[in-house]
A protein has these predicted regions:
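Gly/Pro-rich interdomain helix-loop hinge
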Residues: 10-104, 119
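Short, amphipathic C-terminal "tail helix"
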Residues: 99-145
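Acidic catalytic cores of enzymes that act on phosphate-bearing nucleotides/polynucleotides
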Residues: 2-4
Length: 145
């Protein structure tokens, strides 16, 4: 996803720094992948290794996501594309206008699915799921699919 959104808005002066994109998207991608039981177990193991606590796998995944979101806060990385601004600092309306994001969303989603990195993802998204996931990353909404 980060490969396909990084320069997708460069004509608006909105090059999303690759590391910032990964940081913004990772909590959402974990929430998406954790719908797969094998991936959820692995995320639980990561949370255990990090000493995050939690009794159930769902709690462990939630704590892992919360940890990553807190790290983004500490690093001054916004939680979503909508608030991504100059030098990756959060702002009320970032570089990527909503109408442009929505206009380009189908193509970005299709390209993200075709990206070599997506092939190693534990859960393979459909076009519709990738568009929904990218919207979650734009608006910072819950991944409930």
């Amino acid at each position: 996803m980060a490969h396909k959104t990084g320069a997708a808005f460069a004509d608006y002066g909105a090059h999303i720094i690759h590391g910032a994109a990964n940081a913004m998207y990772l909590p959402k991608v974990i929430a998406f992948n954790a719908k797969d039981e094998t991936a959820k177990v692995r995320y639980g193991e990561i949370a255990d290794f990090m000493g995050l606590g939690g009794e159930t796998l769902d709690e462990k995944v939630d704590l892992l996501i919360a940890y990553l979101r807190k790290m983004n806060d500490d690093l001054n990385i916004p939680h979503c594309i909508k608030n991504y601004g100059p030098d990756s600092y959060p702002c009320e309306q970032g570089f990527v206008p909503e109408n442009i994001f929505l206009e380009r969303l189908p193509e970005i989603a299709a390209n993200a699915i075709l990206d070599a990195c997506t092939g190693s993802n534990p859960r393979q998204p459909s076009q519709e799921e990738m568009e929904k996931l990218l919207k979650c990353c734009y608006y910072d909404t819950e991944v409930d699919f």
